[in-house]
């Protein structure tokens, strides 16, 4: 008999293939590999607790590569500071970090919200070619909206 989790992942794999979303299909392939080689019992708890941090670290490394290669240096930083786009990007970075902080609080106090966030991320990745950067930012946005709603109650 096929387990519910295997069936669920298989359905998501089909959605990923239909949507031609390589990130989703590779992620599910890795999960299937871990699950069917019985490494899942050891690796899944680690990925569940540390996976987002690992992902953020990999993304951060990718973003910093142009600095490491010398493609971006102090000259480019100075030129960027003259652009209002750079100041918008700076403000956006601050806003996202603050939203993520609220998201951590929400996930801590209301962990069942994670299910809705995961489904929202899956829908965006599978159907709209979104990028799964999601639970912390998603929960941060949810926290901000919920806080605004609470102010008007």
UniProtKB/Swiss-Prot annotation:
It is found in: Cell membrane. InterPro entries: UPF0756_TM (IPR007382). One of its GO terms (cellular component) is plasma membrane. Keywords: Cell membrane, Membrane, Transmembrane, Transmembrane helix. It is a multi-pass membrane protein. It holds the Pfam family DUF441. The chain crosses the membrane at residues 8-28, 54-74, 87-107, 117-137. It comes from the Bacteria. Belongs to the UPF0756 family. This is UPF0756 membrane protein BCQ_4399. It comes from Bacillus cereus (strain Q1).
